[in-house]
Amino acid sequence: MIIDTTEVQAINSFSILESLKEVYGIIWMLIPIFTLVLGITIGVLVIVWLEREISAGIQQRIGPEYAGPLGILQALADGTKLLFKENLLPSRGDTRLFSIGPSIAVISILLSYLVIPFSYHLVLADLSIGVFLWIAISSIAPVGLLMSGYGSNNKYSFLGGLRAAAQSISYEIPLTLCVLSISLLSNSSSTVDIVEAQSKYGFWGWNLWRQPIGFLVFLISSLAECERLPFDLPEAEEELVAGYQTEYSGIKFGLFYVASYLNLLVSSLFVTVLYLGGWNLSIPYIFVPEVFEITKRGRVFGTIIGIFITLAKTYLFLFIPIATRWTLPRLRMDQLLNLGWKFLLPISLGNLLLTTCSQLISL
């Protein structure tokens, strides 16, 4: 039997070509993910620097100034220091829960970025249930905190984990009801559709004006979800040393630190998407994609402009949670639970009822 070498070479080259296509496909699939992770990392470093500078301004003192120009590398220096610190394990604790807890907290928050549109259709997962997927994923983080508190075998850590779980449950429900009201107004649960529904009238089309009560409830609930003052009871220094973080050191403590700022950034991004018009300009009847959709370069430029607008709104909004840290006193645990269950929950239910009635009347 004679084998044609030309056919063999053609088959081999075809198989090599197919395998190269698969490799390129995997690479192109990973590039957006790595780009998003890099962008999120830079975003967190910027938030840390902003918080230190704004806090210094509020307290009339000098902020970080030695690590890089204007102290912009101070957060990077702190992170590097944590990387090289010793990783201690509690002698009588549950080491598996102790080690898994920080990872669950960080991963659940990172997954929330999948449904955030940074510009026109610049989103990793444009799902029809995008906002509710974010709520479902973010509710996993307190499980990691509770595991960390329990695995530490420390009464302060365990109390901090219990507080984190109770606080998350109390404020998750009003937050969900506010998101449901926005979903009813936009006739969609997709984050992209919600932004596009606010694009027609520019600044006046923002859901902030159509849902002022919902915006205030969402703001308070998101601050509680991020455990920012006045809702930082899970890690109250005067009561619980450092809460569920008490026994942690090194990179694991750094993961909690990163998770806190990741959660703050994702909450601010969702405020921008749900209430502040997302990537759109604040000029009536001017929709960013339609302005730059003429050429390929125009599309790229429009995408960059959309990213810039989204981030500008997000970082401007971040001034509110940073300022409240040095303005409002910490609540007691009973006050926190009463605020969530007896005040915010009825208000968010009433807001949802009003939104539903207005939508039914407009049919």
UniProtKB/Swiss-Prot annotation:
One of its GO terms (molecular function) is quinone binding. Keywords: Chloroplast, Membrane, NAD, NADP, Plastid, Plastoquinone, Quinone, Thylakoid, Translocase, Transmembrane, Transmembrane helix. One of its GO terms (cellular component) is chloroplast thylakoid membrane. GO terms for biological process: photosynthesis, light reaction. It is found in: Plastid, Chloroplast thylakoid membrane. Its main location: plastid. It catalyses: a plastoquinone + NADH + (n+1) H(+)(in) = a plastoquinol + NAD(+) + n H(+)(out); a plastoquinone + NADPH + (n+1) H(+)(in) = a plastoquinol + NADP(+) + n H(+)(out). It is a multi-pass membrane protein. Pfam families: NADHdh (PF00146). Its EC number is 7.1.1.-. The chain crosses the membrane at residues 30-50, 104-124, 127-147, 248-268, 300-320, 343-363. NDH is composed of at least 16 different subunits, 5 of which are encoded in the nucleus. HAMAP family: NDH1_NuoH. Belongs to the complex I subunit 1 family. NCBIfam families: PRK06076.1-2. PANTHER family: NADH DEHYDROGENASE SUBUNIT 1, NADH-UBIQUINONE OXIDOREDUCTASE CHAIN 1. This is NAD(P)H-quinone oxidoreductase subunit 1, chloroplastic. It comes from Lactuca sativa (Garden lettuce).
